[in-house]
C-alpha cells in the first residue's frame, strides 16, 4: 500500500513538472528544449566572462609561443578575446579531466572548446524552443526557420571550419580583434571575397537592411492619424486593435510611382515573407560558403588571366587582391612556418649553370 502511494505521488510530481515545463502561461516559456538550453548557455556565458577577464595566455599555434587574450593579462575590450584551443590539441575532445592539470588545460586553450560546444548546443536548443513555443500556441514554424540562419553561421565558423582545417585553433576567436583577425586570415587562405556564396550573403545582409529601412519608412510615412497635430502619431495606436494602423494602398501607390508599379507589394503577407526570406537565404548561403571553404573549395582564382600578344601579364583587380592575400598570409602565424602555404608549394627554380 505504501509503495502504491509513493508511486502515485512520484507520478503526480512528474506530471506537474511536465505541465510546468510545457506551460505557455509562464512568464518565460521553458519547454523541453529549454531544459537543455538553460544550463548550456549559462555554462558558456559564465566561462566566457571568467576567461575573458582572467584566463592566462594560450599556446594557440602549438609552438610554445602563448598569446594573451584576457583583461588581466594586458588586453582591453577591443583587443581581448578567448583564444582558440591549441593546435597541439587539434580536434580532440578536451574537457578539464583530459588534462594533467588545470594549468595545462588553460595553457592549451581548453576554455575555448568548452564555451563553443556549450554555446552551439545552447543556440540550437533555443531554435528548437522557438519551434516548440510556436507549436504550443498554434503558430506557424517560420520563426525557428529564420533563426536557423545565424545558427548555421555560428556552426560554420565555430565547428565546421575547424573540422575542415583539422584543428580548433583555426576557429574564430571570441573577441572583437580576434574576429577581424579571423576574417583577414580567411580571406588570405580562401579568397572568400571572390566566392559567389559570400557575394550572395553580402546581398542578403545589405539588401535586408535596405528593405527593412524602406518598409519601416513607408509604414511610418503612411500611418492613419488617430491623434491631433499636437500629439505624436504613435499615440494613436492601441495594442491589439483590429483596424489597420497604416494605409498600405497609399504606401503601394507612393512606391509604385517612385520606381514602377510592380516593384511594390500589394499583399502585406507576401511583403513580410520577402522581408524575412531575403536575409535568411543570404546568410544560409554564407554559412554554406564557409562550410565549403573549410575543406578548401575556395573562391574564384582569376590571377594572371589577362595577357597581351607577347604573353606578358596585364594585371587586373584579381591580381591586386591576390597580392594582398599573399601579404596577409605572410603576416599571420609568422613563427609557425617559414613561408605561407602558397609560396612553399611552388617548385624550386634551378639557378645552377
Curated annotation (Swiss-Prot):
[CaMn4O5] cluster binds at residues 170, 189, 332-333, 342, 344. The record marks 161 as: Tyrosine radical intermediate. Fe cation binds at residues 215, 272. GO terms for biological process: photosynthetic electron transport in photosystem II; response to herbicide. It is a multi-pass membrane protein. The chain crosses the membrane at residues 29-46, 118-133, 142-156, 197-218, 274-288. Pheophytin a binds at residue 126. GO terms for molecular function: chlorophyll binding; electron transporter, transferring electrons within the cyclic electron transport pathway of photosynthesis activity; iron ion binding; oxidoreductase activity, acting on diphenols and related substances as donors, oxygen as acceptor; oxygen evolving activity. A quinone binds at residues 215, 264-265. Its EC number is 1.10.3.9. The D1/D2 heterodimer binds P680, chlorophylls that are the primary electron donor of PSII, and subsequent electron acceptors. It shares a non-heme iron and each subunit binds pheophytin, quinone, additional chlorophylls, carotenoids and lipids. D1 provides most of the ligands for the Mn4-Ca-O5 cluster of the oxygen-evolving complex (OEC). There is also a Cl(-1) ion associated with D1 and D2, which is required for oxygen evolution. The PSII complex binds additional chlorophylls, carotenoids and specific lipids. Chlorophyll a ChlzD1 binds at residue 118. The record marks 344-345 as: Cleavage. It comes from the Eukaryota. The record marks 190 as: Stabilizes free radical intermediate. Its main location: plastid. One of its GO terms (cellular component) is photosystem II. It catalyses: 2 a plastoquinone + 4 hnu + 2 H2O = 2 a plastoquinol + O2. Residues 345-353 form a propeptide. Photosystem II (PSII) is a light-driven water:plastoquinone oxidoreductase that uses light energy to abstract electrons from H(2)O, generating O(2) and a proton gradient subsequently used for ATP formation. It consists of a core antenna complex that captures photons, and an electron transfer chain that converts photonic excitation into a charge separation. The D1/D2 (PsbA/PsbD) reaction center heterodimer binds P680, the primary electron donor of PSII as well as several subsequent electron acceptors. PSII is composed of 1 copy each of membrane proteins PsbA, PsbB, PsbC, PsbD, PsbE, PsbF, PsbH, PsbI, PsbJ, PsbK, PsbL, PsbM, PsbT, PsbX, PsbY, PsbZ, Psb30/Ycf12, at least 3 peripheral proteins of the oxygen-evolving complex and a large number of cofactors. It forms dimeric complexes. This is Photosystem II protein D1. It comes from Pinus koraiensis (Korean pine). The lineage of its organism: Eukaryota, Viridiplantae, Streptophyta, Embryophyta, Tracheophyta. The gene is psbA.
Amino acid at each position: 500500500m505504501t509503495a502504491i502511494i509513493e508511486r502515485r505521488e512520484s507520478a503526480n510530481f512528474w506530471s506537474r513538472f511536465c505541465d510546468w515545463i510545457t506551460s505557455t502561461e509562464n512568464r518565460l516559456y521553458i519547454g523541453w528544449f529549454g531544459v537543455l538550453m538553460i544550463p548550456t548557455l549559462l555554462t558558456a556565458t559564465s566561462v566566457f566572462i571568467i576567461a575573458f577577464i582572467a584566463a592566462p595566455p594560450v599556446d594557440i599555434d602549438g609552438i610554445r609561443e602563448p598569446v594573451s587574450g584576457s583583461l588581466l593579462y594586458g588586453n582591453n575590450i577591443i583587443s581581448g578575446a578567448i583564444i582558440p584551443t591549441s593546435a597541439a590539441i587539434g580536434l580532440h575532445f578536451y574537457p578539464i579531466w583530459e588534462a594533467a592539470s588545470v594549468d595545462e588545460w588553460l595553457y592549451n586553450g581548453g576554455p575555448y572548446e568548452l564555451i563553443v560546444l556549450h554555446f552551439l548546443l545552447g543556440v540550437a536548443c533555443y531554435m528548437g524552443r522557438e519551434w516548440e513555443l510556436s507549436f504550443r500556441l498554434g503558430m506557424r514554424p517560420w520563426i525557428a526557420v529564420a533563426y536557423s540562419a545565424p545558427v548555421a553561421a555560428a556552426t560554420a565558423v565555430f565547428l565546421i571550419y575547424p573540422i575542415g582545417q583539422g584543428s580548433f585553433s583555426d576557429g574564430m576567436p571570441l573577441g572583437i580583434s580576434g574576429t577581424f583577425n579571423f576574417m583577414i586570415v580567411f580571406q588570405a587562405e580562401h579568397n572568400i571575397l571572390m566566392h559567389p556564396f559570400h557575394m550572395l550573403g553580402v546581398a542578403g545582409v545589405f539588401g535586408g537592411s535596405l528593405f527593412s529601412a524602406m518598409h519601416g519608412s513607408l509604414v511610418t510615412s503612411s500611418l492613419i492619424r488617430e491623434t491631433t497635430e499636437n500629439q505624436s502619431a504613435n499615440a494613436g495606436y492601441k495594442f491589439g486593435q483590429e483596424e489597420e494602423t497604416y494605409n498600405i494602398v497609399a504606401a503601394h501607390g507612393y512606391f509604385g510611382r517612385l520606381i514602377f508599379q510592380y516593384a511594390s507589394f500589394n499583399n502585406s503577407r507576401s511583403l513580410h515573407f520577402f522581408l524575412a526570406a531575403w536575409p535568411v537565404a543570404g546568410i544560409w548561403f554564407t554559412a554554406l560558403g564557409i562550410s565549403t571553404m573549410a575543406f578548401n573549395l575556395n573562391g574564384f582564382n582569376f590571377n594572371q588571366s589577362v595577357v597581351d600578344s607577347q604573353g606578358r601579364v596585364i594585371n587586373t583587380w584579381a591580381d591586386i587582391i591576390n597580392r594582398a592575400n599573399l601579404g596577409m598570409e605572410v603576416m599571420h602565424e609568422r613563427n609557425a612556418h617559414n613561408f605561407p602555404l602558397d609560396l612553399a608549394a611552388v617548385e624550386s627554380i634551378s639557378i645552377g649553370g
